[in-house]
Amino acid sequence: MAKDEEKNSQASAAPNEGEVKAKQEQTSAKEPAAKAGETEKVADLQKQVEELTKQLDDQKDQNLRAQAEMQNMTKRFKKEQAQLLKYDGQDLAKGILPVLDNLKRALEIEVEDENGQQLKKGIQMVHDHLEKALADHDIKEVEALNQPFDPTTQQAVQTVAASGDQKPDTVVQVLQAGYVLHDRVLRPAMVIVAQ
């Protein structure tokens, strides 16, 4: 009987070995399929990583562009503010210039009596104070008389023949003074030019 049991156990063990081999073959067959599935997942994940990296790079680029635009806008705003402050008194100065012209005309009048002299002295003081106030704000008269004609700051209203020691294209008479604020012409000088 012991022999029969031994045969039975060997017979039962033999199918177990066959089952083990079959299971191993199934597992071996499943492994490439599992590896193929994992490879696909890895490829998908790598693709997602690449897409997300590209999106991140695009966002970084957009962010840098937005920051640069903001910096440019800030610089432009500051420059415009500086220009506004620099030329702040332009309109007021243009309104005052005719008053200054009238004061100059009043000073050109010849007076002989004491009252006229006192009045002229007062006009001269007002004129001087007004010119000083304009100069304090960088509003200056254009130097034109006996200077070469400059079309950027002067306007020729008449030409005359050059005489004596006058050079051609030289201002021989100023009819109305011109003024500049910093580098901007408020009013060109009205001049007569020798030809």
UniProtKB/Swiss-Prot annotation:
This is Protein GrpE. GO terms for molecular function: adenyl-nucleotide exchange factor activity; protein homodimerization activity; protein-folding chaperone binding; unfolded protein binding. Participates actively in the response to hyperosmotic and heat shock by preventing the aggregation of stress-denatured proteins, in association with DnaK and GrpE. It is the nucleotide exchange factor for DnaK and may function as a thermosensor. Unfolded proteins bind initially to DnaJ; upon interaction with the DnaJ-bound protein, DnaK hydrolyzes its bound ATP, resulting in the formation of a stable complex. GrpE releases ADP from DnaK; ATP binding to DnaK triggers the release of the substrate protein, thus completing the reaction cycle. It holds the Pfam family GrpE. It comes from the Bacteria. Belongs to the GrpE family. Keywords: Chaperone, Cytoplasm, Stress response. It comes from Limosilactobacillus fermentum (strain NBRC 3956 / LMG 18251) (Lactobacillus fermentum). The lineage of its organism: Bacteria, Bacillati, Bacillota, Bacilli, Lactobacillales. InterPro entries: GrpE, GrpE_coiled_coil, GrpE_head. GO terms for biological process: protein folding. Residues 1-60 are annotated as: Disordered. GO terms for cellular component: cytoplasm. Homodimer. Residues 37-60 have a biased composition (Basic and acidic residues). It is found in: Cytoplasm.
